[in-house]
Amino acid sequence: MRLAASSLLLGAAASLLSSATALAVRSDNPGSSAGYFVRSLPGQPPGPLIKMHAGHIEVDHATNGNLFFWHFQNKHIANRQRTVIWLNGGPGCSSMDGALMEVGPYRLKDDHTLAENEGSWHEFANLLFVDQPVGTGFSYVNTDSYLTELTQMSDHFIKFLTKFFELFPEYESDDIYLSGESYAGQHIPYIADAILKRNADASIKWNVKGLLIGNGWIDPSNQYLSYLPFAYESGIVEKGSPIADQIEKQVAVCVKTIAEKGRHHVDLNQCEQILQDILAKTKHHKDGKEVCWNMYDVRLEDTYPSCGMNWPPDLSSLTPYLRRKDVLQALHVNPDKTAGWTECAGAVSSSFRALKSKPSVELLPDLLKEMPILLFSGNKDLICNHIGTEELIHNMEWNGGKGFELDGAPGTWAPREDWVFEDEPAGIYQSARNLTYVLIYNSSHMVPFDFSRRTRDMLDRFMEVDIGKIGGTPADSVIGGEKAPITSVGGTPNSTAAVEKEKERVDQARWAAYYRSGEVALVLVASAAAIWGIFIWRQRHRRRGRRGSYAGLGGLKMTGGSRDRLADGRESFDEDELRDLTVASPMFERDRDLEAAEARRYSLGGVSDDESDDEGRIEKRPSVG
């Protein structure tokens, strides 16, 4: 009997040590969340790094389809946990534009130096950037397997999110906001619709709370026909001129095509030609070069036929930075599976014509029954201009009314309210029946590039952030003559309640991470050591022929207690058989130090250059044209 008990103890210790070794190995590969942890970032600003994860997630084994993501943890804890997913357009343009030129925590000062972005959207929300469809940016797929339709894209995205939440279950119960710009105006509604369908049969629902689409390509039939009116409004084309007459003829061809083929198309070549004609017929010579208007910011010019493809200026730093070997290693990019980073993948765009897909505007009425949607437009963008967005709203029927009619008052339109940000006219707000439209002054196709702090104020208001208990200095934002709710702070969380909530979340996330990462190996090793110690003590005790107490175990202290569970009920590893055994050892002292360091890192965020010199900088990119 004694031999059996001794064998059992030895077997348990060996089993625990074996498990610890296996877990330690798994913690360093991409199959665990620890394998995605970004420990350092080349060119990072001074001070501790924001907590982030990055890498690939497989969405289609048969075609070698993998999507790349980059996730940043929030800076402040607000009244609820939120995750904002950001997608750039194209199709085929990388969301690293959004991460490093628009709403992410960092901006590039040059090709090797990062600066903090004062207007980063991670202030009150976790940020998740995804390169999609497959083949975009750092994502990859077999070259004969590029996607062609919007439903294929949304299916891949559901698979991506499923695996992402398996790796990071602490974020699955967050309020989710889907955001992006340009051709993401097609992607975002399709993804939202797919999530709602998935939720119908899922035990754990994904809480999609809203959509934000900037300068979105949503309703092609209305937006194609907005090109010439915008060219008139902005002075690019003079109404009644010979150039105008030529372009009007192409508009007539487009109108005829829509009448014949119907409005249920995402891509019509005859209508695409309108924009090409505007750019080609208004080109001129300047300083010995042939130049044209920048289609993303009509305040600017570019060499023909680029017409904006050389902008924004940050792109000249972004491309070499994202091709650096140390950056690829830091972000866990698979160097064998992807070519050097390019902003927009021509092969993806050429394949993704969505010829069998209906335009996303047809999904909006049903989505507006389930969630609020915000459409925002920079007023200097030509390719996805504000006139087209306003026309699609005016012609759309949703929630019992048409356009911005007020509830119960047909024919009465919601007022346009002036938005003043820090004593400067910032734009116009208009809302009705779950839809909000924001026109943003002096901004391009890439609004957050121009005014990141203003767009964050817009985001935080849309998410109904309540920071009353956090403290800090609020932004000065006024809508319709009334002070807007406090939605922005400076500094770090400074109230007792905020600190306690922060500590609680860090503790919960830490214990969840224990199981998913190799750190659980520390507990198992310590437990195995304790069992081994018990075995040695019992052997000595039997040899001495007398009773003893556990207090005599060299340096090992036994205490009662069990681990806390995550608030959402997910279990960490089972401790029923070890609940009376906790080891006080240098490993646990190290864990306390790590916890303190993690708590400090959790509160850090970004700050960047002042917006006053941002005017004139613009984004790329739909390849919508």
Swiss-Prot record:
Ranges per topology, Cytoplasmic: 538-625
Keyword S-adenosyl-L-methionine: no
Compartments, as annotated in UniProt: Golgi apparatus, trans-Golgi network membrane
Family assignment from sequence similarity: Belongs to the peptidase S10 family.
Compositional bias per record (Basic and acidic residues), positions renumbered to this chain: 615-625
Catalytic activity, EC: 3.4.16.6
Organism: Tuber melanosporum (strain Mel28) (Perigord black truffle)
TM stretches of this protein: 517-537
Active-site residues annotated for this sequence: S182, D381, H445
Lumenal topological domain residue ranges: 25-516
Protein name: Pheromone-processing carboxypeptidase KEX1
GO-annotated molecular function: serine-type carboxypeptidase activity
Disulfide bonds: none
GO CC, one annotated term: membrane
Annotated signal sequence range: 1-24
Function recorded in the entry: Protease with a carboxypeptidase B-like function involved in the C-terminal processing of the lysine and arginine residues from protein precursors. Promotes cell fusion and is involved in the programmed cell death.
Membrane topology according to the record: Single-pass type I membrane protein
Tree of life domain: Eukaryota
Gene that this polypeptide is encoded by: KEX1
Lineage: Eukaryota, Fungi, Dikarya, Ascomycota, Pezizomycotina
